[in-house]
Amino acid sequence: MVGGTVVGDLQVLYQPDRPELGYLPEGPIGCGSGEISWVAIQHGPEQDVGSLNVLDPAAGFNRHVELPGRPGFAFPTDDPDVFLVGVERNVCRVHLGSGECEPVSDEVDGGVENTIINDGVEIDEGLVFGCKDLAFDDFKAGLYFWRAADRRVFQLRDDQLCSNGKVVRRDGTGWWIWDIDSPTKVVVRYRLDPASGTLSDPDTALDLTHLPFFPDGMVEGRTPSTVI
């Protein structure tokens, strides 16, 4: 069933005082302590590096960690000093204190060029994340499941252009995943089996092709039947 859309108001939560941090911000993710993690994908049009950031909105204080590449997402872990970050083509453990960036996955999108990790979402068993074609030209970027227990990466799709927004909900032993490939203007739904690392065929959950703009992100709404 194709849903409808509702328009709401927005307000600025935080404006970085460094222009490089405001060039391509992505996220944010709540850390459970009142803080928010977010990434600056790259620090300018000619840059190929970005940063992990942890914001305390109440204090207006932002911690900043330079990364050796361009990040697509950052999620907190049980260790408050460690975040799981998608950097270029690897899932990495990044330490806030030292800035160490340790790959914990094989490289993704190995069969194609000019793609990087762009967006992800946490599930109990690990991460589901997608990539984007930097030229926004070829539908060649992958969608992946990284399983934390054995650090194994499963390729779920290899035909996306810019994977850019995900919502997940538990369904028995698996997960329903809602995903946007931005240029298609369509939200699709799959069922992920984390034990086998397989994805069902997609069905259309929300058709936005009638709108003049492209969807650039998606998060869970306040009720089970809505997304933002």
Task: Pin down the residues of each PLM region.
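Recurrent small/Gly-Pro-centered beta-turn motifs in extracellular repeat architectures
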Residues: A40-I41, G86-E88, C131-K132, D179-D181
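Hydrophobic alpha-helical segments and helix pairs
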Residues: G99-L156
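A short helix->beta-strand "capping" segment at the edge of beta-propeller domains
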Residues: V2-G22, L55-G60, E66, S105, ...
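A short loop-to-beta-strand structural motif that recurs across blades of beta-propeller domains
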Residues: V49-N53, N90-C92, A141-Y144, V186-V188
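Beta-rich, blade/repeat-based domains predominating
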Residues: E20-G34, P68-F83, G110-V128, R157-W175, ...
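Short loop/turn segments immediately following beta-strands, especially the blade-tip
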Residues: L96-G97, Y190-T198
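Beta-propeller fold detector
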Residues: R63-L67, E102-V108, F154-D158, T198-D207
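Short, solvent-exposed loop/turn segments at conserved positions within beta-propeller repeat blades
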Residues: H43-V49, L134-A141, I180-K185
